[in-house]
Amino acid sequence: MTNNFGKLYLVPNLLGATKPEQVIPAGTLEIVRKLKHFVVENTRTSRRVLSRMGMDNPIDDIEFIELDKHNARNLDLMEHLGACLQGEDMGLMSEAGTPCVADPGALVVDLAHSAGIQVIPLVGPNAMILALMASGFNGQAFAFHGYLPIKSPERQNAIKDLERRSMANNETELFIETPFRNNAMLQDLCKNLHPATRVCVACNLTCEDELIISQSIGEWKDYKGDLNKKPAVFLVYSEPRRSNRFHK
């Protein structure tokens, strides 16, 4: 960059009640601790996380600019990235994990690029990538679908569409669910997917009570555990099968 703007650092957040130094590299923490300006989704929770990271500056002296995710497409450059324009570095932080993946932070990054502000992603935990790594499914071709519809028949159709897409493209399909609906989601997967289709559920990633189970729907039908209120990533993988059995 040839201008005198500050840099926009993409700051990883924790995925749960984990010590920052256990999941975030020392080099990343060193950069984050020096920052004085942050774009965040929620000031209260962000203050709490940054306090755990051990900021160089008093937390009350740090500026927080909240991103209105319901009106994120109408961003104001000076309001959200004014510090960068004045030559100071800023951080963009998600509510959990890495920014701009399954959250509205990408719009801030797009705004920064348009203004000529250098964007620097920092290393940290990402639930989707960790789940994919641990699933044993295809890591060469995969897609993230966010949240599936809540009500049927849209939900049922979405689940079957994931299976068809996975089989047609030899692709791993990832999505997330509101934690209190996890058990209902697993039931819907068992009802609508072929018994040979494989599903991985990765809960509480990086935490002490982390749970990762990867098995076929036929095996999931015998599962007696409780997934309720555990932040989770769901993965569906249906390899091309020789059998002609498939949902119409």
What are these regions (language model features)?
Residues 1-69:
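Glycine-rich, flexible N-terminal cofactor/catalytic loop recognition
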Residues 2, 6-10, 88-89, 168-248:
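A contiguous loop/helix-start segment that scaffolds small-molecule binding in enzyme catalytic cores
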Residues 9, 103, 107-165:
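Class I SAM-dependent methyltransferase SAM-binding "motif I" and its flanking Rossmann-like core
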Residues 15-17, 95-99, 179-180, 239-242:
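Short glycine-rich anion-binding loops that position phosphate/pyrophosphate groups of nucleotides
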Residues 32-38, 116-120, 172-173:
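Short active-site oxyanion
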Residues 39-40, 91-99, 172-177:
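Acidic beta-strand-to-loop metal/phosphate-binding motif
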Residues 68-69, 76-119:
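Glycine/small-residue-rich loop that forms an oxyanion/phosphate-binding "nest" at active or ligand-binding sites
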